[in-house]
Amino acid sequence: MLTIELDDLKVFMADDGSAKRIHFATSHAHALRKDSRGKPFAWFNVPFRNTIEPLMKKELGSSNFALFLSKTTDKPFRMVFNEKEYEDILAFMGKYKDIVFLRDCLDLSLSLSMNRIDENTRTEIGELEYQAKYHPESSEYSNVIASLTERMQGFLDSIPFFKDADYICVVPSSHAFVREIVSGLKGFDFSDISSSLSWNKTSELKNAESLEDKLDALLNSHLLIADEVDLKEKSILLVDDLYKSGLTMQYVAMMLKNAGCSRVFGLTLVKSLGNN
């Protein structure tokens, strides 16, 4: 069982410049390349194994699938020796084209989309997230929530692991509309325990500027988990709207694991353009 300690969060905060996301629609569109000499048939290169390796293993239907670390770059790679595996990986990249794979302390961590294409242009989901967050009074608000719910529903229906969680929970500091989305999900076996988590005080969280200040604020905000929720050996899917630094979600995941959870998955609507 993967554990999360306070030191893990501090290491994560000490940004060394390493990539924290994989996005096949943009920065990693050329992760799969045919070898010009045909030896091997192709190469698959990504900056980290987190989340992507277990999902590829499951989606490609091979328990033997693995990404290996390069001795020269210390980055994951895979030699592809035949056209079938090449096409399988290409299909995986197509299915997850807009999804953002995240490197953090959770067992698995994804965003449905980037929030922006560039500084001036939002993605489709990024625009919906923006409208839901900043224009709840709009006559289109219910349609926006319905669209976001439909997208999350479709995503969870189509991928492994996440839909099999025992619980789903909105990160306590999330905007209210995220709970509306989660409450609209249908046909899953997980129970919504969002109301069982809360902060004892949140003012410091809102005022924190640096990651160091935010971690101090998280420690001082005292996350409360209701006693009646049985977390022992349970898996939980944490949901939030925007993944920026990811610190709050990882802190909540740490506290849930300290309370007995075996696995914590993270799913956000959008990933910010910054933070690698």
PLM feature spans:
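Active-site-facing substrate-recognition patch
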Residues: 29-31, 38-42, 61, 70-161, ...
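Generic N-terminal amphipathic/basic segments
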Residues: 1-88
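N-terminal phosphate-binding loop and flanking beta/alpha elements of the actin-like ATPase fold
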Residues: 133, 165, 179
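Short, aromatic/basic amphipathic alpha-helical patches
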Residues: 55-61, 89-92, 179-189
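Short catalytic/ligand-binding loop motif for oxyanion handling, primarily in non-cytosolic enzymes
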Residues: 176-179, 275
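Short glycine-rich phosphate-binding loop at a beta-alpha junction
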Residues: 162-173
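Histidine/lysine/aspartate-rich catalytic loop segments that bind and position anionic ligands
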Residues: 185-206
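PRPP/pyrophosphate-binding module of the type I phosphoribosyltransferase fold
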Residues: 3-10, 202-276
